A protein has these predicted regions:
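Conserved, mostly hydrophobic/aromatic
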Residues: 23, 87, 114, 130, ...
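Hydrophobic faces of well-ordered beta-strands that scaffold small-molecule active sites
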Residues: 8-14, 31-33, 59-63, 95-97, ...
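Glycine-enriched alpha-helix->loop->beta-strand junction motifs that scaffold or abut catalytic
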Residues: 25-34, 55-59, 91-94, 119-124, ...
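Active-site-adjacent beta->alpha loops and helix N-cap segments on the catalytic face
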Residues: 17-18, 37-57, 72-79, 99-122, ...
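N-terminal amphipathic alpha-helix/helix-capping segment at the start of soluble metabolic enzymes
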Residues: 1-13, 17, 53
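Ordered, amphipathic secondary-structure segments that act as subunit-interaction surfaces
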Residues: 82-99
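A short acidic, helix-capping loop that chelates divalent metal ions and anchors anionic groups
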Residues: 66-72
């Protein structure tokens, strides 16, 4: 809860415009849009982002090009950089991103590149670190790096397989 805010911000994960409407109608302040929830979440299409943006609830869009780990090669980072630009251009208010090195540390260069793509597309875009933090070698140390990178939000399950288990 921010200063002057009377209640916490409610963000609900959705996979469709219909889900975004339900979230809006039940008091969501914003939605996080992705596809492939059973795979840990994947980047939705530009058309899906547009349809969710049309609902009117601010959307944060997950940018993740494949299931599995969060260690991405140069080709995948280039793809996700293009996806960041695409989802912002399609109406996303922000992106949910992340990348780790093979050693389990935050891939600062990749995260900075994705952040830069978002802010070039929209200087007001919010950039959130996703659940890569939950499998990082040092989650607390990883979180400490985020302010210097300009990331102000973290999507986490508290290090557990599901958020309810990590509370």
């Amino acid at each position: 809860v921010s200063a002057g805010q009377s209640r916490p911000t409610l963000e609900i994960a959705v996979t469709s415009a219909a889900g975004a409407r339900v979230a809006r109608d039940h008091g969501a302040d914003r939605v996080e849009l992705c596809t492939g929830l059973e795979l840990g979440g994947l980047t939705p299409s530009a058309a899906l982002v547009e349809s969710v943006a049309a609902v009117g609830t601010p959307a944060q869009v997950l940018v993740r090009c494949r299931p599995g780990d969060f260690v991405h090669d140069a080709e995948e980072i280039a793809l996700m950089t293009a996806e960041v630009r695409s989802v912002i251009a399609s109406g996303a208010r922000g992106v949910v991103i992340g990348a780790l090195t093979a050693e389990g540390t935050l891939d600062v260069e990749a995260v900075a590149r994705l952040r830069d793509a978002a802010r070039e597309a929209d200087p007001a875009a919010e950039v959130t670190l996703h659940r890569a933090i939950d499998v990082a070698a040092d989650p607390v140390g990883t979180a400490a790096l985020l302010p210097a990178l300009g990331l102000t939000r973290v999507l986490t399950s508290g290090g557990a397989p599901a958020a309810g288990q990590g509370l």
